[in-house]
UniProtKB/Swiss-Prot annotation:
EC number: 3.4.25.2
GO CC terms: HslUV protease complex; proteasome core complex
Function: Protease subunit of a proteasome-like degradation complex believed to be a general protein degrading machinery.
UniProt similarity note: Belongs to the peptidase T1B family. HslV subfamily.
Taxonomic source organism: Methylorubrum extorquens (strain CM4 / NCIMB 13688)
GO biological process terms on file: proteolysis involved in protein catabolic process
InterPro entries xrefs: ATP-dep_Prtase_HsIV_su, Ntn_hydrolases_N, Proteasome_sua/b, Proteasome_suB-type
UniProt keyword annotations, A-Z: Allosteric enzyme, Cytoplasm, Hydrolase, Metal-binding, Protease, Sodium, Threonine protease
Protein name: ATP-dependent protease subunit HslV
Description of how the protein assembles with itself and partners: A double ring-shaped homohexamer of HslV is capped on each side by a ring-shaped HslU homohexamer. The assembly of the HslU/HslV complex is dependent on binding of ATP.
Catalytic activity, reaction form: ATP-dependent cleavage of peptide bonds with broad specificity
GO MF terms held by the record: metal ion binding; threonine-type endopeptidase activity
């Protein structure tokens, strides 16, 4: 994700993929963090559990910004327990209107057993038409691969692993060090 200050190197850093299939929802993310043309870290953890394990989420963008947003989402999930959509809408409203938050540069994919959502600082709270959604510099590669695989025999986790492997082979800002979280879906 590009920084707003043109004097700083561009930050590119990830592929996050969500697949919902066969009673499971899986979010996977790679571990590469790049600053400009340099790989800074290869094993970052960009996918995690929230709300005592009831929600999984992954982020693309500036790491500190994403952690801030995860903390805010965690607070909203405590305020609206079991209501991921409501918590996300409330977070996004704050993200758009708060002077500090609106500067944050990140996107998030979050899911619980019922719904998966994409959140952005532009005010987006989007649910995918299909069971697949991706963000980040390699997101379109992973999304294309997952859509091609979703009608086959592979389960959700296998689709995530295969699609992320394909994205890592194409996108220079994505690597094969995966963190994957899974939930049983409704």
């Amino acid at each position: 994700m590009a920084q707003t200050d043109d004097r700083l190197p561009q930050m590119h850093a990830t592929t996050i993929l969500m697949v919902r299939k066969g009673g499971r929802v899986v979010i996977g993310g790679d571990g590469q963090v790049s600053l400009g043309q340099t790989i800074v870290k290869g094993n970052a953890r960009k996918v995690r559990r929230l709300a005592k394990g009831a929600v999984i989420g992954g982020f693309a963008g500036a790491t500190a910004d994403a952690f801030t947003l995860f903390e805010r989402l965690e607070a909203k999930l405590e305020q609206y327990p079991g209501q991921l959509s409501r918590a996300c809408v409330e977070l996004t409203k704050d993200w758009r209107t708060d002077r500090y938050l609106r500067r944050l540069e990140a996107m998030m994919l979050v899911a619980d057993k019922e719904v998966g959502l994409l959140l952005s600082g532009a005010g987006d709270v989007l649910e995918p038409e299909t069971g697949v959604m991706a963000i980040g510099s390699g997101g379109n590669y992973a999304l294309s691969a997952a859509r091609a695989l979703e009608d086959g025999e592979l389960d959700a986790e296998a689709i995530v692993r295969r699609s992320m492997k394909i994205a890592a082979e194409i996108c220079v800002y994505t690597n094969g060090n995966l963190v994957i979280e899974t939930l049983d879906a409704a």
